[in-house]
């Protein structure tokens, strides 16, 4: 209701975690973006990657699909191992970019806010998967668990992964407790939070500056009497 009653809303960003990815519509194979809208999304996504330092900008439907994909489909923007932004034929129009890809193999997110904001209200909507833990050291398009472990040891002082240790559980008996800690793996640790916030705020301001700037070109007045105009 709030959005419906505020047609002045022109842009939105929602923040999720994690992955270091800028997401945009479409989220389903049936949805196609007009070329003019896609150009705008691609242009802002590229600028967003530059300020956030994230590695990928993609539609929701394309993200990491099919399984094991290197995220090199049409309409995706990817940061290379040298830090440059590479675009993959951005004006395809959205939807199913993989040709023979079957619908059941794809990530179709029906009922998502991104598509709703865009299609129902004409709002330029992004969703950012903030914070990427680890680096794609072998440039295969994904950050593996071994790469994350290496990153934790070399960059995070081994603070994010807890070694598996035996524990006598009152109900389950002998178990092991350990693995990735939620804070640090899915969300940045406090020393890294400020930088993460600042980069995302810069992308928000960048998007806001790209919206139309309204001006009043002419004002007419009509006297209605009793000092009322």
Protein language model regions, located:
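Metallocarboxypeptidase
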Residues: 1-228
């Amino acid at each position: 209701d709030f959005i419906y009653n505020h047609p002045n809303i022109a842009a939105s960003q929602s923040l999720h975690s994690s992955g270091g990815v800028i997401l945009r519509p479409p989220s389903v194979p049936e949805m196609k973006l007009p070329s003019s809208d896609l150009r705008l999304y691609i242009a802002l996504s590229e600028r967003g990657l530059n300020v956030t330092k994230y590695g990928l900008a993609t539609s929701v439907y394309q993200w990491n699909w099919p399984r094991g994909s290197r995220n090199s489909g049409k309409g995706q923007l990817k940061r290379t191992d040298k830090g440059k932004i590479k675009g993959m034929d951005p004006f395809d129009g959205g939807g199913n970019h993989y040709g023979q890809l079957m619908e059941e193999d794809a990530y179709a997110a029906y009922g998502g806010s991104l598509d709703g904001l865009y299609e129902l209200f004409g709002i330029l909507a992004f969703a950012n998967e903030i914070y990427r833990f680890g680096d794609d050291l072998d440039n295969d398009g994904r950050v593996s668990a071994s790469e994350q472990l290496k990153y934790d040891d070399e960059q995070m002082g081994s603070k994010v992964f807890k070694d598996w240790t035996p524990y006598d559980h009152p109900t389950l008996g002998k178990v092991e407790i350990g693995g990735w800690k939620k804070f640090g793996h899915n969300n940045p640790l406090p020393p890294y939070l400020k930088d993460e916030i600042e980069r995302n705020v810069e992308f928000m301001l960048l998007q806001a500056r790209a919206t139309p700037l309204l001006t009043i070109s002419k004002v007419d007045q009509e006297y209605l009497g009793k000092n009322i105009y």
